[in-house]
């Protein structure tokens, strides 16, 4: 097994202001996790458990408040989540080009992917309109197509398969299944057990910012379902 990501004693807290009183919310606490290259890992837990925060730390969007995050040198990573990663004044096509260049492609290589990305999104003329004019569903289509078709080494999916119309959700899941090569690492947050079962061979259950269980998909999902 080749290690792709390693989180050691990772903690994260956010400032809160409730009723005029300042305080803190502990999103993650001393979390330790290793992800190997090629892992298909599902993250489950209730709302506010820390799943989305964890993905953002993995992606480098948030620096951890404590602990360390290591990523294997040379591996590209992308987080697909509603509203993240787009420059609103650029068009969909320009955002796709920028994403490809930021992942290390030359401009010529990046341009060679733009038609396929545009066709997958089914955005039509809106592909060449500013992203600030997009609905959340249109942003989702663009983000998913860009992350998937650029062959990112580590793909982080935050409920991205649960939005959009049913036709696009089916198309996205089928495309993702075809892209699940041996070396591609996928970390998926999803509330639907069938999506987790279909894609993931390992599941991590997070509760109140800590790992409650880590193991075989069926076993962890069963334990989670039986929890009070």
Language-model regions, residue ranges each:
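The feature captures the beta-strand-to-loop junction immediately N-terminal to the Walker
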Residues: 44-46
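ABC ATPase "signature
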Residues: 214-215
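Conserved ABC ATPase "signature" region
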Residues: 97, 109-126, 145
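ABC ATPase nucleotide-binding domain signature region
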Residues: 40, 52-100
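Conserved catalytic segment of ABC-fold P-loop ATPases
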Residues: 198-205
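H-loop/switch region of ABC-family ATPase nucleotide-binding domains
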Residues: 190-191
């Amino acid at each position: 097994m080749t290690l792709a990501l390693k989180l050691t004693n990772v903690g994260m807290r956010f400032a809160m202001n409730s009723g005029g009183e300042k305080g803190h919310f502990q999103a993650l606490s001393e979390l330790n996790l290793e992800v190997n290259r090629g892992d298909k890992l599902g993250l489950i837990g209730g709302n506010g458990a820390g799943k989305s925060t964890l993905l953002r730390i993995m992606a480098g969007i948030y620096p951890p408040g404590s602990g360390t995050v290591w990523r294997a040198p040379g591996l590209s990573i992308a987080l697909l989540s509603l509203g993240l990663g787009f420059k609103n004044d650029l068009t969909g096509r320009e955002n796709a080009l920028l994403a490809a260049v930021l992942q290390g492609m030359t401009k010529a290589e990046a341009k060679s992917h733009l038609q396929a990305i545009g066709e997958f999104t089914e955005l039509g003329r809106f592909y060449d309109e500013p992203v600030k004019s997009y609905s959340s569903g249109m942003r989702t289509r663009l983000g998913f197509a860009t992350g998937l078709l650029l062959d990112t080494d580590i793909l982080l999916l935050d409920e991205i398969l649960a939005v959009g119309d049913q036709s696009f959700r089916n198309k996205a899941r089928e495309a993702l299944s075809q892209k699940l090569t041996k070396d591609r690492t996928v970390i998926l947050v999803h509330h639907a057990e069938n999506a987790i079962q279909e894609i993931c061979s390992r599941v991590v259950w997070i509760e109140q910012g800590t790992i409650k269980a880590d193991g075989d998909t069926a076993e962890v999902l069963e334990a989670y379902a039986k929890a009070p």
